[in-house]
Amino acid sequence: MEKLIVGTLLLTVLSGGISQSDMDGKAFIFPQESSTAYVSLIPRVKKSLQNFTLCLKAFTDLTRPYSIFSYNTKTQDNEILLFVQNSGEYMFYVGNSAAIFKAPTSLYDPVHICVNWESASGIAEFWLNGKPLGRKGLKKGYTVGGEAKIIIGQEQDSFGGNFDAKQSFVGEIWDVSLWDHVIPLEEAHDSCDGGNLINFRALTYEENGYVVTKPKLWT
């Protein structure tokens, strides 16, 4: 009985295949190139954003372009998009406008990405593996829509769909957090815990296609 209660607390399956789970210590694995494998992340609250902070960890050995995090609304593609165009070249979109951050990377190392953006100044700040890659400006005064589809594993070319296998993510993603405010990234890079919109320790999500959940290999 005790084990059953604990299991119920850790994983609750909701209608339509949606799950709630403490994903601490686990990773989503996207084992192969696909246009059908992805995970929908469901925020605790749907709200418009004038500031946000996004942190996540990932591993891949892809050398082609791929999407890591895709946030679309019905009226705007690439409201928030984290996309790798080339090795070490990170394209960060807000409101379908991009800033590019470049860093030397080892092809076979996991990455810890933290980025924030504030509407008032338009400044986006990007950190990779605990080191700042600088600050750039985009979409000053913009408001990110709140009625969104949030997807990891694919890049949305329409609201919740129109995926291209050649932009799909192959590898592992874990410790995803999203906040509705700016967090100093020199603090956030130590941990990806506690997002008030998306929190990996209390995650609501839906797996689609060939996605596997396993204990994470890296911290």
Swiss-Prot record:
A biological process from GO: innate immune response
Residues binding Ca(2+) 1, per UniProt: D77, N78, E155, Q156, D157
Gene3D superfamilies linked to this entry: 2.60.120.200
NAD as UniProt keyword: no
Compartments in which it is found: Secreted
Domain called Pentraxin (PTX): residue spans: 24-219
Database matches in CDD domains: PTX
GO molecular function: complement component C1q complex binding; metal ion binding
Cofactor(s) this protein requires: Ca(2+)
PROSITE patterns: PTX_2
Free-text comment on the cofactor: Binds 2 calcium ions per subunit.
Keywords: Calcium, Disulfide bond, Metal-binding, Secreted, Signal
Expression induction or repression: Strongly down-regulated in colon by dietary heme, or by dietary depletion of vitamin E. Up-regulated by calcium.
S-S bonds: C55-C114
Tissue-specificity statement: Expression is restricted to small intestine, stomach and colon. Within colon, expressed in epithelial cells located within the lower to mid region of transverse and distal crypts, but not in proximal colon.
GO cellular component term, pick one: extracellular space
Signal peptide: 1-19
UniProt subunit comment: Homopentamer. Pentraxin (or pentaxin) have a discoid arrangement of 5 non-covalently bound subunits.
Family under the similarity heading: Belongs to the pentraxin family.
Name the UniProt record assigns to this protein: Mucosal pentraxin
Organism lineage string: Eukaryota, Metazoa, Chordata, Craniata, Vertebrata
